[in-house]
Design a protein with these regions (language model features):
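N-terminal secretory signal peptides that target proteins for export/translocation
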Residues: 1-11
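Sec-dependent signal peptide recognition
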Residues: 11-18
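C-terminal motif of bacterial Sec signal peptides marking the signal peptidase cleavage site
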Residues: 23-26
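Exposed acidic/Ser/Thr-rich ligand/metal-binding surfaces
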Residues: 28-41, 160-380, 407, 440-452, ...
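Subset of Sec-pathway N-terminal targeting signals
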Residues: 28-186, 512-550
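Soluble, acidic/polar mature domains that operate outside membranes
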Residues: 73-78, 384-398
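Long, acidic serine/threonine- and proline-rich intrinsically disordered regions
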Residues: 101-104, 108, 117-123, 374-378, ...
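Residue-level recognition of well-ordered beta-strand positions that form the cores
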Residues: 113, 162-164, 180-182, 199, ...
């Protein structure tokens, strides 16, 4: 069987299973219980469409990346379609940030976000021959998936700040303002001792190749990185929760691996009781001045005990006060509760990643282990004050669920995002320079706003954060020059990712006539130094989306 035939197997089996279920329904099988559906994932493309020349070309390019699933695993996967035929993936649909007139709202405030789960999840949809639902696309997580060459701190602060202004590729009348933050890095050997609790969902919904088997392989990658001073506990939950492994030294790697290997899936999902028990184990193994973190591996399909969103989120908020962070690692398809996974990590002062293959697991838990585990700054907030003499309108690209009130910036009681060692954070504003055509009609009776400060300043950037050890917040202020020039590769590439995220949502109200072909060309020309092939992979994903949209 050719590799291309193997890549076509999943849509074929999915189509076969759906036809089989329709036939059964026609024989009189019915249900009186009507299930309320959250936003459904996009339906798989027809086989004829996936066999077209554009899609085949895009799929062939993907062969250079991690190998596809074997035919045997795909066949096993198809046997579970009876409960997978009704997509139950849950996403939060947030409207795009609005356009603001500087004369009316000169200040923009938001919390940083270092999550990257949206990008990996979107990649999963495209690799399956499907376009992602709108709610799965979070622009800031897609942009922040990639590393950028930002300046490191030189003044003793935990991160450096970079700004850049250049032309917008999709609108000749606007400019892109890029704000970049680069946290100081640390080698794994330099990290404080770690007390880690692996909290694993072993319920029936995880009994599939991309569920528990991938979780086990992922956790064993992390086990290989453990040091003697680290300790690990293993807690599992299905219908009930239990401790599989008490706090164990990182030197006992064989013992930890054996405990992971023995895990099997089956039963309902009492996620809340598992989280409670995991925090209990974290307290039992707590390391003063160390890294204390729970890593929750699940599809988020909680259905026993406390399962409502607000109660689970409040539980994470309450427990973070104990000094234990919560990282969520998303696995699985069809019943995946992405909204819960992202919000639990935010509430638990952790980070969220989606693991769609072992390569992504290595990126998160090996290549970026220091970023995943070690916090260098807490409650990081960004505030931009635009100069009305230079800018008439602006909009923040992404960060819709991170918006803060202006007064929240100076309030240390308001929670915000954490930044890990080596993390990069990117924020993009699309701005309308004074005198250029904007999105909003000018007011008839409004007077011209007066400039304050230096007229050469485009804006003032303020960054507020707390040290990793806690305490009062500190402030960094940087004026942003109105000088714009040739865009760097980093800005051009991040602009391509931002364009792609907007194009996937489909309405094109901001990206105008810029096509997916234009986006792929821009990203291809801005790949620069790409040691891990991440930017090249992005180009291929854009090409796949282009084929699927035709």
């Amino acid at each position: 069987m050719s590799p291309l035939s193997t890549l076509h197997l999943r849509p074929f089996f999915q189509g076969f299973a759906v036809v089989s279920l329709i036939a059964l329904a026609g024989c009189g099988l019915s249900s009186s219980r009507e299930v309320a559906k959250p936003e459904a994932a996009a339906v798989a493309a027809p086989l004829s469409e996936l066999s077209s020349q554009p899609v085949q070309g895009a799929l062939v390019k993907r062969m250079a990346l991690p190998a596809p699933m074997t035919a045997r695993l795909m066949a096993q996967d198809s046997t579970a379609m009876a409960y997978r035929s009704e997509p139950r993936e849950q996403y939060a649909n947030l409207p795009d940030n609005p356009v603001h007139r500087v004369a009316e709202t000169p200040v923009s405030t938001f919390s940083v976000d270092v999550d990257t789960g949206s990008y990996a999840n979107v990649r999963r949809f495209l690799n399956e021959g499907r376009l992602p639902p709108d709610g799965a696309v979070r622009l800031e997580e897609m942009v922040n998936y990639f590393p950028y060459g930002y300046a490191l701190p030189t003044d003793g602060s935990p991160f450096g700040v970079t700004t850049e202004v250049a032309a917008t590729p999709w609108n000749p009348d606007t400019q892109l303002l890029r704000i970049g933050i680069k946290a100081s890095d640390r080698a794994v050997a330099q990290l404080a001792p770690a007390n880690l609790v692996f909290l694993v969902d072993v319920s029936g919904s995880m009994d599939r190749p991309e569920g528990l088997p991938l979780v086990k392989s992922t956790l064993k990658l992390l086990v290989d990185q453990l040091r003697e001073q680290d300790r690990v506990s293993l807690v599992v939950y299905a219908g009930e929760s239990r401790v599989v492994l008490k706090p164990t030294s990182g030197r006992d790697k064989a013992k930890i691996r054996n405990a992971i290997d023995r895990l099997t899936a089956g039963g309902s999902t009492a996620g809340a009781s598992g989280i409670e028990l995991a925090y209990q184990m974290a307290r039992e193994g707590f390391i003063d001045n160390g890294i204390n973190r729970i890593l929750l591996a699940t599809d988020g399909d909680f259905n026993v005990g406390v399962s409502d969103f607000d109660s689970l989120k409040q539980m994470a908020v309450d427990r973070r006060k104990s000094g234990v962070s919560l990282t969520t690692l998303g696995f699985g398809v069809d019943n995946y509760n992405e909204h819960l996974m992202e919000q639990l990590a935010d509430a638990g002062d952790g980070n969220y990643a989606y693991i769609d293959n072992l390569r992504e697991a290595r990126k998160v838990l090996v290549d970026q282990l220091s970023s995943t585990l070690a916090i260098v700054a807490r409650d990081v907030k960004l505030q931009v004050e635009f100069n009305p003499a230079q800018v008439s309108e602006y909009r923040l690209l992404g960060y819709e669920n991170r918006a803060l009130k202006r007064e929240d910036f100076n309030n240390d009681k308001v929670d915000a995002g954490e930044i890990g060692a080596g993390h990069t954070v990117t924020a993009l504003y699309e701005i309308v320079p004074k005198g250029k055509k904007g999105w909003i009609e000018p007011l008839r009776y409004a007077g011209e706003p007066s400039a304050s400060g230096s007229s050469a300043e485009l804006a003032m950037l303020r960054v507020r954060y707390k040290p990793a050890a806690g305490g009062e917040s500190r402030l960094i202020e940087r004026p942003i020059s109105n000088a714009s020039g040739k865009a760097s590769d980093d800005l051009r590439f991040s602009a391509a990712v931002a364009a792609f995220a907007q194009q996937l949502k489909g309405d094109g109200r901001y990206t105008g006539s810029m096509s997916l072909s234009d986006t792929a060309a821009l990203a291809r020309s801005a790949r620069g130094d790409d040691p891990f092939g991440l930017r090249n992979e992005f180009v291929q994903l854009v090409e796949m989306a282009q084929a699927l949209k035709h």
